[in-house]
Design a protein with these regions (language model features):
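Acidic, glycine-rich segments characteristic of secretory precursors and extracytoplasmic regions
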Residues: 18-68, 442-452
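Inward-facing hydrophobic residues that define packing positions of alpha-helical scaffold repeats
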Residues: 47, 113-116, 182, 189, ...
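Hydrophobic-face positions in mid-chain alpha helices that act as interaction patches
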Residues: 231-338, 342, 397, 432
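Conserved, well-structured interaction surfaces
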Residues: 44, 52, 83-155, 193-197, ...
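Short, surface-exposed recognition loops and adjoining beta-strand edges that mediate ligand/DNA contacts
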Residues: 33-34, 61-81, 197-276, 380-384
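Long, intrinsically disordered, low-complexity segments
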Residues: 18, 184, 273-275, 381-452
Length: 452
C-alpha cells in the first residue's frame, strides 16, 4: 500500500498536486506510475515540482505567504485587502480557527511536506540512482521539508511531525511539542548538511547547497539558544570562498550577487518576482499592503536602505510607502526571490557572539549592514545597548522578507510589545489557531491552541 500510494503521489506530483496531506484521502486511481526514481532526470523532475509548489503555494511563497502575513500580523505592513480570504483578520490580530487563509497555509504546506517525504522515500528505495544523486536529492528534500516545518511551528506552536507515507498513521497523528520538533529539525537539517555538497548544481543558485542547509541549521540553533553552535555554524558560511558581502545597496536584490545562498526563480522567463506582484502600487492607494509608518520612521533619513528599498507614493496629498526591494514588473532579467542571503548569517553571528558576552567580536557583523547603508559604524557598545541596536538594525535590513521581524520578536520574547501599536493584541496570540477543518478531520490534534 505504501509503495502504491507513493507511485500515485509522485505521478500526481509530476503533473499537478494531491488533495490534503495530513488527511490526504485514498487515491481514486491506484495504478502505479513508472519507476520515477530509477532515473535521475525523472527524480529531479519530481523534486523540481516540490520547489515549484513551495514557490507558488506554500507558507514560503514570496506572494501571500509568511512574508506578508507575518509582516502584517506584526508591525511591518498595513493591510488594504478587501476580500473574504482572511487577510484583514491576520492584520487586525483577530484570527479564528475558521480563517480561510490559515487553513490554506496549513493544507498547502503539509501537501509539500508529504511530497518531500515521497521524494525521500523514493530515492532511499532506488537501486539505480548513483550515490551522489541519491544524496543530493534527499538532502534538498530534507531541507525543503525542514524549512516548511520550521515556519509552521513558529506560526502554530505544537504541530504534527511526520516523515511517513502511511495514510492511516498520518490521518490520526497527534501534535509534537515545539521543543521536540525543533530538536528533530536540528537532526534532519544536520543530515542535509552531510548529504549536500558545497558546490551548487546550478550557477544561478536556485537549488540549495550545503551552506544553505547550514544557514537553516544556524537559525534553528539560534531559536534553541544554542549560541556556540550557532556561532560555529555561521562561521563556516562566512569563511567560505563562495560568498562575499555585497557592498552596493542597489545590487542586494539582483540575482547574480555572491551574497546569495539560495533563491527561487520565477515560473517563466521575464516574470516578476512574487514580491513585486504582491506589493506594487503606484498613482493610487495600496491594493494589498503598504509599509507601516512605524517601520518607515525606524530609518534615519540618510539610511541608504530607506532611499533604495522604500518607495513613497503620494496621491492627493496622502502618502504611503511601498516595499521596493524588488523592482522589475515585466521583462525581469535580474531578480529572483532570495530565500537566504549572507546578511542573515552576519546577524546570526552577531547575536550568537553577543549572547556569549563577546560583544567586541560581534560588532563587525552588526556594522556590516550599517556601513553599507551609509551609517556610521559603532566602535564600542555596552552589552545591553548592543542587543538594542541589533534589533533595530535587523528590522531595517530584513523588512518584508519572510517574516524575519515576527520570528525575531518571538525569539526575543518581545511580541507583546506589539500591543502598543495593535489594539487587538493579546499574549496568547504568539501562536495562531489550528484550522478548524483539520481538527474536525483529526481529533488527535486537539486541544486547540489557548485562547481560540
Amino acid at each position: 500500500m505504501k509503495k502504491i500510494y507513493l507511485f500515485f503521489c509522485i505521478g500526481a506530483l509530476l503533473l499537478t498536486a494531491c488533495e490534503d496531506l495530513i488527511d490526504v484521502g485514498y487515491p481514486s486511481n491506484q495504478l502505479g506510475t513508472p519507476q520515477v526514481f530509477e532515473d535521475v532526470q525523472t527524480a529531479d523532475a519530481a523534486l523540481a515540482n516540490v520547489y515549484a509548489l513551495v514557490r507558488d503555494r506554500s507558507v514560503l511563497t514570496g506572494g501571500s505567504g509568511i512574508g506578508s502575513c507575518g509582516g502584517s500580523y506584526a508591525d511591518e505592513l498595513d493591510c488594504y485587502y478587501n476580500d473574504q480570504n482572511g487577510h484583514m483578520d491576520i492584520y487586525q490580530n483577530q484570527l479564528q480557527e475558521t480563517n480561510t487563509y490559515i487553513s490554506t497555509i496549513w493544507r498547502d504546506s503539509y501537501q509539500q511536506i508529504y511530497y518531500a517525504n515521497a521524494v525521500i522515500y523514493g530515492v532511499e528505495q532506488s537501486a539505480t540512482l548513483s550515490g551522489d544523486d541519491r544524496n543530493r536529492i534527499k538532502g534538498e528534500a530534507l531541507l525543503l521539508r525542514s524549512l516548511l516545518y520550521f515556519y509552521l511551528q513558529q506560526l502554530f506552536g505544537d504541530i504534527p511531525y511526520t516523515a511517513s507515507l502511511d495514510y492511516e498513521y498520518n490521518r490520526t497523528i497527534g501534535k509534537t511539542k515545539a521543543a521536540i520538533l525543533l530538536e528533530q529539525l536540528e537532526t534532519d537539517v544536520t543530515e542535509a548538511t552531510v548529504l549536500l555538497e558545497d558546490d551548487y548544481r546550478d550557477a544561478e543558485r536556485i537549488y540549495p547547497n550545503r551552506k544553505a542547509a547550514q544557514l537553516l541549521l544556524a537559525r534553528i540553533y539560534l531559536t534553541r539558544e544554542e549560541w556556540l553552535l550557532a556561532e560555529q555554524t555561521a562561521k563556516k558560511i562566512i569563511q567560505s570562498p563562495l560568498y562575499h558581502y555585497e557592498a552596493d545597496i542597489h545590487e542586494v536584490f539582483h540575482k547574480s550577487g555572491k551574497h546569495i545562498l539560495w533563491q527561487l526563480k520565477p515560473q517563466n522567463s521575464g516574470d516578476a518576482t512574487s514580491e513585486v506582484t504582491l506589493y506594487y502600487f503606484d498613482n493610487s492607494a495600496p491594493h494589498n499592503y503598504a509599509l507601516t509608518q512605524h517601520l518607515v520612521d525606524a530609518f534615519p533619513d540618510d539610511d541608504l536602505r530607506k532611499q533604495a528599498w522604500i518607495a513613497e507614493i503620494t496621491v492627493n496629498g496622502q502618502s504611503w510607502y511601498r516595499p521596493d526591494k524588488y523592482k522589475n514588473r515585466s521583462n525581469n532579467t535580474n531578480e529572483y526571490s532570495i530565500m537566504f542571503r549572507l546578511e542573515e548569517v552576519y546577524f546570526i553571528m552577531a547575536e550568537a557572539l553577543a549572547r556569549q558576552n563577546k560583544v567586541d567580536e560581534a560588532l563587525p557583523y552588526l556594522n556590516a549592514s550599517r556601513e553599507r547603508a551609509g551609517l556610521v559604524p559603532f566602535t564600542s557598545l555596552p552589552a545591553e545597548e548592543f542587543h538594542k541596536e541589533l534589533r533595530v538594525e535587523k528590522r531595517r535590513e530584513f523588512f518584508a522578507e519572510f517574516a524575519h521581524r515576527f520570528l525575531d520578536l518571538k525569539r526575543w520574547g518581545e511580541l507583546d510589545e506589539l500591543s502598543a501599536l495593535k489594539p487587538n493584541w493579546e499574549e496568547y496570540k504568539h501562536v495562531w489557531p489550528l484550522p478548524q477543518s483539520e481538527l474536525l478531520m483529526n481529533p488527535n490534534l486537539y486541544p486547540q491552541n489557548t485562547g481560540y
